[in-house]
Amino acid sequence: MKVKKTYGFRKSKISKTLCGAVLGTVAAVSVAGQKVFADETTTTSDVDTKVVGTQTGNPATNLPEAQGSASKEAEQSQTKLERQMVHTIEVPKTDLDQAAKDAKSAGVNVVQDADVNKGTVKTPEEAVQKETEIKEDYTKQAEDIKKTTDQYKSDVAAHEAEVAKIKAKNQATKEQYEKDMAAHKAEVERINAANAASKTAYEAKLAQYQADLAAVQKTNAANQAAYQKALAAYQAELKRVQEANAAAKAAYDTAVAANNAKNTEIAAANEEIRKRNATAKAEYETKLAQYQAELKRVQEANAANEADYQAKLTAYQTELARVQKANADAKATYEAAVAANNAKNAALTAENTAIKQRNENAKATYEAALKQYEADLAAVKKANAANEADYQAKLTAYQTELARVQKANADAKAAYEAAVAANNAANAALTAENTAIKKRNADAKADYEAKLAKYQADLAKYQKDLADYPVKLKAYEDEQTSIKAALAELEKHKNEDGNLTEPSAQNLVYDLEPNANLSLTTDGKFLKASAVDDAFSKSTSKAKYDQKILQLDDLDITNLEQSNDVASSMELYGNFGDKAGWSTTVSNNSQVKWGSVLLERGQSATATYTNLQNSYYNGKKISKIVYKYTVDPKSKFQGQKVWLGIFTDPTLGVFASAYTGQVEKNTSIFIKNEFTFYHEDEKPINFDNALLSVTSLNREHNSIEMAKDYSGKFVKISGSSIGEKNGMIYATDTLNFKQGEGGSRWTMYKNSQAGSGWDSSDAPNSWYGAGAIKMSGPNNHVTVGATSATNVMPVSDMPVVPGKDNTDGKKPNIWYSLNGKIRAVNVPKVTKEKPTPPVKPTAPTKPTYETEKPLKPAPVAPNYEKEPTPPTRTPDQAEPNKPTPPTYETEKPLEPAPVEPSYEAEPTPPTRTPDQAEPNKPTPPTYETEKPLEPAPVEPSYEAEPTPPTPTPDQPEPNKPVEPTYEVIPTPPTDPVYQDLPTPPSDPTVHFHYFKLAVQPQVNKEIRNNNDINIDRTLVAKQSVVKFQLKTADLPAGRDETTSFVLVDPLPSGYQFNPEATKAASPGFDVTYDNATNTVTFKATAATLATFNADLTKSVATIYPTVVGQVLNDGATYKNNFTLTVNDAYGIKSNVVRVTTPGKPNDPDNPNNNYIKPTKVNKNENGVVIDGKTVLAGSTNYYELTWDLDQYKNDRSSADTIQKGFYYVDDYPEEALELRQDLVKITDANGNEVTGVSVDNYTNLEAAPQEIRDVLSKAGIRPKGAFQIFRADNPREFYDTYVKTGIDLKIVSPMVVKKQMGQTGGSYENQAYQIDFGNGYASNIVINNVPKINPKKDVTLTLDPADTNNVDGQTIPLNTVFNYRLIGGIIPANHSEELFEYNFYDDYDQTGDHYTGQYKVFAKVDITLKNGVIIKSGTELTQYTTAEVDTTKGAITIKFKEAFLRSVSIDSAFQAESYIQMKRIAVGTFENTYINTVNGVTYSSNTVKTTTPEDPADPTDPQDPSSPRTSTVIIYKPQSTAYQPSSVQETLPNTGVTNNAYMPLLGIIGLVTSFSLLGLKAKKD
């Protein structure tokens, strides 16, 4: 493979996204009447367009339209039958006509059979030969008729004398019979009269009996009906009384039970009351005693307290007097001020008093109105309550009465419904029984009527058969007599040529069954009809096939042994359908059909033949024949397979062949035939010496056809070359192929020699190569075949034929037929079946019918009580309106009072000790009163039951009279037996027939490509030039003058006619074209007609026109024929040719044909398809492109079409992918490397050379930007190697996803196209997505993944321990390839940060491993990592172990985060960024920045990290709820640093500046 890369302008980012290429719109091309050829039509566009070629199922980018329907003219041309134009030839028949006329005058039945069609000859030589044959046949027919006529005249004279003698004797016998018959008739009349009188008397008695019986039955029925009616009334009343009494008793029992239960309940309640009263009394007496004791104690304590109080009161009163005087003085001054204040406030008070008065008046008015409202409201409510109480009382009474009425009605209804149900049940049973009786009567009647109808039909048939029987018997006996006479005559001639040496009648009529139906089963293989046709068109049978002759013995069966030749069931093949009009070696122009199987030695095919119309055995119809054909395992043919062509007409037999294209020495092929014949009753026919014809057993110098291993007995035909030797039937003594060779008497094929052509069914001496077998029993067999003569006898025993070698090879094949057409002469046939005397049928007995039973009367519906009327509620009175409360005036405030002076506090009076409260005296209990018991209910009085009715006894029925015994009619006299008249000589029937002979000009249509190669039923590419040649055979001598010679060709849909090229290819014709019907017409010019008519006595060669055009559809079949019309007579239709374009599944002519669909899939390095999956930047996509060529297998496109070339275009998105052209590989379907294909890469269409742009433009393809194009260096070699052989190619084109795609993320599309013969087809679009890898870095004070506090950009105190949180990029689920690298690289500032040697790694998302284990988000993953630290440079790299990464399922997402623990050791501002590496591609995180100010408590510089300064502990309080640390490990993994003295306490460190924490306080440790 050559690789070339071309540079040019890049495609615009504005005009192209990451979506894949789409196709250009192709201008539609007209399929008829268009002046411009398809390959000249191009479409250019500056924008991307889409594929429109989906109408055919093929993703075409140019000429996408589906083939339209065939025109009406084309369909009619290919299907409608028309009379064929012929020239009739008359042959003189004067002698034959005179012989027929003489025979008819003599009384011979002269039958003119249908004219025998000698066919339509095509050449003058054939015409002369056929005329000679007809003349000879007419002469023989005239001689045979004259011979029969003379014999018949002699037979008639002898017969008339014998008839006169017998008639006199029969007359005397007749007269005696008539006398006996008269006496018998008189006796019969006497007996009939006596019997009639007895019958009349009996019938009178029977009529009286029937009348008396009817009267008795009527009376009994009336009595029974009356009784049943009374009984029903009694039962209904009895049931009502019983149910009423039962209901009353049930109600009483319920009331008693309820009363008892109620009284039991009351008694129990009274007992409880008594218990509670006793308990209350005891409790009261206890409490009273306690009260009296407590009262005495309280009274004594209160007396002591009173004495103490009086002493303290005296001291208090003295001090009070002093204080009161001092306070009085101060009060006087205060009261003067108060008086002035009071005066001022008096005025205000007066005004306020008026306001109060007004308010009180308003209030009084309101309260009076309110009182009146309340009184009115109470009156209304009282009235409404009284109305409601009255309504409720009435409602209660109504409901009580309603319940009583409803219950009474329900009880009555239930009783009625029960009676109805019982009545319905009884009547249903009666109805069911009556229905059964009706059915039995109907069945009996139907059975009787059926039997009667059958009897009547049988009787009619019997009477007819009885009448026909003597006729049939006579016909049968006559035929048997005739056969016996014929056999006796044949016995005299049995040693003469053509006669059976053992004269026999042929009771098996089995000569011809053209309409038989064939079904096959086999343990071999069925063959497709298309495979058989394909085999005929090849190799040794091709020459005849091209002449429309199916030469079965030339077929090379190796062409039937391909795997795709096998069918699932039988398929018929022959000269029918598209082979109509073809000839076969089996029956010339007659239609022949056969099913084909492929067998090995010992394998069989079983054929069942039905729809037999012409076959009989002993005059009885044969309905079915079953043959089993088995390949004799002893056959010596060299190959392994045998083709059996089994004809649908069983009388034509089988063609068997193991011929592989070469003759074989010492070969043989034998087929065992096992067969059974069946009558119409499907029973096997038991043959009794039935004759089976064994014919056409040819023997040449090197080949012998024979029958062997047969059941039955061989019967030789005198003069035949066929005999029996060593159990084999064949030409035992001489050859029979050619007269004069090896003792052969005649030549088997027709030539000028007398007696030649014996090997045809209608040859008078066909017996020369035939014999017969007498068969008996139901199952018979015979093995038939052909063998090299050397297998039968030594060469020394063989006849010598000059110039021929008896050891020559031969074809191992044979056509043989086994039928009843015995070739011996004058073999009589059994055509009449021996009749059986008919048996008189027996009349059926008339049935006795059952009587139906009457139904019971329905019960009477009860009268229901009317329900009471419900009470009406009195409407409530409306309530009065409530008065509105008044709005009161507000009083004015008084002037504030003067401030009262501060008085001395009076002494506190002594406090009297309060008397203790006397205890509460207990209240005597109130005792409950016991409830009285309920009175017992009163038992009801019950109704008396009614008396049942008594039935009236039935009257006895009268005695039936006995039918008399009648006299028997005497036996009539026996019919006279007359002597049969001698059978008159049968009017012999002679048949004669005329012949039809015609000459017909032959037409043939051929379809060829531009290289003049026959492409009929093959495959050519779309846009190919296809030529139709309209050929006519030589015009025969003796024809009429040709005045017009017109060929009309309705072209197929989708075929683009080229008028100029057609005219150029058709000299001698005027060409016209009808665009509306897509039909082209050729008319011979005057000059051409002059050439045809130059000499009518000689044949003349014709010239032919050629239609030139292109096929423009994918997956289309172009069928075409033409009609020749000469002298405006009936047209002659040509054969139908057809060609198909690729892209059509289920194409019968081209089994490999299917849709043209290039495919594209994306795979990873392991060959897994990753279409639609997420791919990582830096990964390699292995695009696998299929160049779909299998549908072109056996294509026959012309050289100019092939030179359009073969290309494959890969339109890849260069924004996302980097082409690895050095790794591109092309292999064929077998895995072999493909050579002779170059690949070029162009950055855009404009950068490609004009040649490439033209190819793409004509194919309707416009890549979006960069593309690579594969092309065949030598189209012809590529076509021969891959296209014509149908071998698909596979292109693997690796492409690397560009690293920058991981920075931005996004999807990209990829599509390809193949261009074959200038036709473009688009592949599917492959879409993949690249995730954006966006690592993030935070600064945290905890190791809790749930803590989202980030102090990036804030202040960190000196000596604080904190963490860098490195959040890796997320790898989405369903990614294309395994992870093998996922690293965190942090280049920290070692001047400000000291790595403590501790880190942790956690899962950021749920991760699923290949073994199904799920690692939940937040799970620590440190154990799956390693760390590398360079403290000098301030760098740490945390790497996931590759084994762990590869254990992660590609269907799972993946993301991790690392915590690296640091200690701030310096003052200043520090920035930091980390790098996340994923599968070899690096991604930078954001930059974090933190600041550390001077420590006010310790301004010294930080010490070396190995000698840490005093640690700082920060205590903080959360604003609301306390922080809960996550459940992670409390220790970090050691990365090699030995100093781990400082470990941060998780979840308790905070900063003051950005966390809004309260109570921040630092202190020294």
Curated annotation (Swiss-Prot):
PROSITE patterns named in the record: AG_I_II_AR, GRAM_POS_ANCHORING
Skewed-composition ranges (Low complexity): 42-54
Database matches in InterPro entries: Adh_isopep-form_adh_dom, AgI/II_N, Antigen_C, Cross-wall-target_lipo_motif, Glucan-bd_C/Surface_Ag-I/II_V, LPXTG_anchor, SA_I/II_PAC_V_sf, Surface_Ag_I_II_A_rpt
Compositional bias (Basic and acidic residues): 72-81
Signal peptide as annotated in the record: 1-38
Pentaglycyl murein peptidoglycan amidated threonine carried by residues: 1535
Location(s) in or outside the cell: Secreted, Cell wall
Comp. bias (Pro residues): 946-961
Propeptide: 1536-1565
Stretches for region Disordered: 42-81, 827-985, 1486-1511
Main subcellular location: secreted
Superkingdom in the source lineage: Bacteria
Ag I/II A repeat placement: 146-220, 221-302, 303-384, 385-466
Location of the region described as Heptad repeats of Y-[EQ]-X-X-L-A-X in the Swiss-Prot/TrEMBL record: 203-448
Protein name: Major cell-surface adhesin PAc
Source organism: Streptococcus mutans
Taxonomy of the source species: Bacteria, Bacillati, Bacillota, Bacilli, Lactobacillales
Gene that this polypeptide is encoded by: pac
